[in-house]
Amino acid sequence: FLSAYGQKNTELKLDEAGNFHTEMPVSHPSVAYLSVGGSVISFLLSPGGETKITVNLREMTRASSRLRKDAKPEGKKVYFEGLNAGLNTEMNSGLEIPLCSVELKDLYDMNPDQYKAYCMQKYEEADKAIYANKKISKAYAELLTVLNKDALYGLLCGYDYQLLQAYAQQKGLSVRDASKEYRSPE
């Protein structure tokens, strides 16, 4: 499956050689995701650009295999050509860069203003970690800061659901049952 952020998944049809071709119009630089088996490959698309992706299925399955994961790697899992090739390669290098996120256990009994302050703190911590990371390029750091802002936006827009989930988790209830009794603290 292939999907650009915020768009519907597109199922890809492979030819007999295992190749596919598709076009995905974007009006601005957008992160897209290619799902192959249980793995997800993220990459940047730009208007008017072309991106070629070669997936090394042999390596991808070796790396996720319990029996063969310690065997010698057989190349990279994915190769990129075309516009943003270097940045896309860096995005899939395996380096973990955490973005703004919350822990439900921390949210219990927070009111919306406390939640906003908590999210802003998590956002600032992630932003500092991105810029302090000397293993990534300036272009990748800039992309990550945009994605970090997007993560913050999603958390702030969904504050009511996040607080409800935290309440449900703390009380051992389903979200549906929790929604019947939950009231945001003032």
Locations of the language-model features?
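A non-transmembrane, solvent-exposed segment enriched in polar/low-complexity residues
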Residues: 1-139
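Extended amphipathic alpha-helical segments with heptad-repeat/coiled-coil character used for oligomerization
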Residues: 141-186
